[in-house]
Amino acid sequence: MKIAVMSCIHSNYEALNTVLLDIDKHSCEKIYCLGDLVGYGPYPNEVVAQIRSLNVTTVAGCWDEDIVEGLNSCECSFPSLLAEKRGKLAHEWTNKEIHPENREFLAQLPHTFREGNMAFVHGSPYSNHEYLLPELDAFVALERVLSTESDVLFCGHTHVPYVRTLDAAHLQVRIKGENGKEQERSFTAPLKKIVNVGSVGEPRHGRPNATYVIYDTNTQEVTLREVHYDYHKTVKAIIEKGLPAIFAWRLAQGMEFAERADDPTHVCTR
């Protein structure tokens, strides 16, 4: 069976519709969405309504959670004060625009979804704000997959697609026992995969094209899809609706405008 997995639509209705047409062209039997339906872009209600109407299996993203709770992410979730300021502007705008029925839909989205040997999350199994970057320490990456009790972990959040295979390996770890003494344990970790599906509506891989993944559950083949769409329409709408112009520039470039946080695994506990 072929499935399509997408993430980070970010209120970009033009990109979503183009990706859905591409999915249909490739005869995928099921669609999964890894959250962040809203935020940054100009069409939050249209995007949520489309996902609802198609009954797409969806998990919550960090933006979806924040809009439901009516909160901004705290400052330590942003790599800079400028990024925080822009993020809060987008949050406040989206919070005012979102319709009650769409907010209710976002509120009931689960953090994690499992099906067969596959797990689906937005950021990581631990937090929607954690980035599973391709250069993440192999042991940490493996632990994240093992925590889901799956073989393939699909994620988004970084807006940059990649496939990482964690080869089978014999591992030795030290665990503190009840008496406080460390004990050595060994186990064999089977082959696992992390598949980051990129972003439909706000790509950051250096091009403005929407990205998503097609996965064959029979052959385990992963196909990273990059789809052209008329991003100029979304760029124009961002400006017309009064959102920060930098969002339009970033969308047109397919680039991040701010520096990355020093610790991508850091999650605020406040």
Label the predicted regions.
Residues 37-54, 67-79, 131, 164-166, ...:
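Metal-dependent catalytic neighborhoods of phosphoester/phosphodiester hydrolases
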